[in-house]
A protein has these predicted regions:
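N-terminal "arm"/small-domain region of PLP-dependent enzymes with the aminotransferase-like
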Residues: 2-63, 71-72
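Conserved small-domain helix->loop->beta segment predominantly found in fold-type I
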Residues: 273-276, 280-282, 287, 291, ...
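Conserved PLP-enzyme active-site core in the AAT-like
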Residues: 2-3, 16-20, 83-312
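PLP-dependent enzyme catalytic core of the Aspartate aminotransferase-like
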Residues: 9, 80, 121, 130, ...
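Short hydrophobic/aromatic beta-strand micro-patches
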Residues: 224, 346-348, 408-410
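Active-site beta-loop-alpha junctions enriched in small/polar residues
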Residues: 158, 187-189, 324, 350, ...
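Conserved N-terminal alpha-helix of the aminotransferase class I/II PLP-enzyme fold
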Residues: 41-93, 115-123
């Protein structure tokens, strides 16, 4: 099956298993629940371990179920290679660790997910890797923050939790002018609504736990390598361009070509630190991927109706959603998301934390939990949970206040969702 000209909805079902399983004729992707793989002979084993022959070596590095998932996500994002790992946090960590060393620096939008913020602000500095966080509403802040030792710029297609939008193409131009890659978290955007590589991103990461899986049942993360960044011409990334002693002097740019970045993560970081996705989780995430477009359409449709309801409610102080003409990122929303977006967003109830908690505790359909992008509608109070590790100043910088509530709008009937929100607001 030629996949080059197929539509997204077809690719999400078929890529990676265009024909039935060759060993069993099974049409569904099998769960290859194994730790190891038999080599044809000693020479074959040596070639695999020396990166001279692609294929399975050991379950910590590769698995055939995982491989289908990786190919499919890479195809949907328009990249040359994908790498699935145990969680979105692992994907983001590897994305940075792959091209940084002690003494290096990263520039990141300050509006990113709290877990990513903690990684960059507190964990990576203990390894000697520092980050400057910038206000992304002024693009010049990115350029001002770049230093001689800066190795990447990091942003999200839709900020977590406020769904702010950054001009990807403008930030990409800044990054490339300084010969560094742009890494984008597209968890909230999804490749169905936006493909960051088409707008200049070099590396795309996902928490596959969210929209890709879609049902709150399995953890997973994925990294997609665009294959477009010229690591050699940059001259800043010896990890990819100079001989690697682990593989007897192999240069990843020679051994893997355009997929050098993704290959090094698998061959070095995954080998040494082992944040491996299980075959079963890869299988479950594949099931979710097959209906991604259908679910996202309903998520967005419902979300826009909820936004309209909340925006006109007397007990709501503010709704943070880029579809609103009053939102500062509305023009970028129209430009980058012509089919709509952002079923995960925040709003402020009038009052403060007490009123926010009472509202949340009065909801009946919405589940109070830390996940998002489930078919079930979800709610949480960011300041006291997901972003509670931030100090007061950091919370204000991320526009998270005592009355802020985050909603993740699911696929239930819209009338039921609005009725639930209405009765809960009546309690405050």
């Amino acid at each position: 099956m030629a996949t080059k000209n197929l539509h997204f909805e077809t690719l999400q079902v078929h890529v990676g298993q265009e024909q039935a399983d060759p060993a069993t004729d099974a049409r569904a992707v099998p769960i290859y629940q194994t730790t190891s793989y038999v080599f044809h002979n000693s020479a074959h084993a040596a070639a695999r371990f020396g990166l001279q022959d692609p294929g399975n070596i050991y379950g910590r590095l590769t698995n055939s179920t995982q491989g289908v998932f990786e190919q499919r996500v890479a195809a949907l994002e328009g990249g040359v290679a994908g790498l699935a790992v145990a969680s979105g946090a692992a994907a983001i960590t590897y994305a940075f660790e792959n091209i940084t060393r002690a003494g290096d620096h990263i520039v990141a939008a300050k509006t990113i997910y709290g877990g990513s913020y903690n990684l960059l602000a507190h964990t990576l500095p203990s390894y000697g890797i520092t980050t400057t966080f910038v206000d992304p509403s002024d693009l010049s802040n990115f350029e001002k923050a770049i230093q001689e030792n800066t190795k990447a710029i990091f942003i999200e297609t839709l900020g977590n939790p406020n769904s702010n939008i950054i001009d990807i193409e403008a930030v990409s131009e800044i990054a490339h002018r300084h010969k560094i890659p742009l890494i984008i978290d597209n968890t909230f955007g999804t490749p169905y609504l936006i493909r960051p590589i088409e707008h200049g991103a070099d590396i795309v990461v996902h928490s596959a736990t969210k929209f890709i899986g879609g049902h709150g049942s399995s953890l997973g993360g994925v990294i997609v390598d665009s294959g477009k960044f010229d690591w050699v011409a940059s001259g800043k990334f010896p990890q990819l361009t100079e001989p690697d002693p682990c593989y007897h002097g192999v240069r990843f740019v020679d051994a893997a070509g355009p997929a050098a970045y993704a290959t090094r993560i698998r061959a070095i970081l995954l080998r040494d630190t082992g944040a491996t996705i299980s075959p079963f989780n890869a299988f479950i995430l594949l099931q979710g991927l097959e209906t991604l477009s259908l679910r996202v359409e309903r998520h967005v449709e419902n979300a826009l109706k909820v936004v309209n309801f909340l925006n006109n409610h007397p007990k709501v102080k503010k709704v943070n959603h880029p579809s609103l003409s009053s939102h500062p990122d509305h023009a970028l929303y129209q430009r980058y998301f012509p089919n709509g977006a952002s079923s995960i967003f925040t709003f402020e109830v009038k009052g403060g934390q007490e009123e926010a908690h009472r509202f949340i505790d009065s909801l009946e359909i919405f589940s109070l939990l830390a996940n998002v992008a489930d078919v079930k509608s979800l709610v949480i109070h960011p300041a006291s949970t997901t972003h509670s590790q931030l100090n007061a100043q950091e919370l204000v910088e991320q526009e998270i206040y005592p009355g802020t509530v985050r909603l993740s709008i699911g696929t239930e009937h819209i009338d039921d969702l609005i009725a639930d929100l209405e009765q809960a607001l009546a309690k405050i």
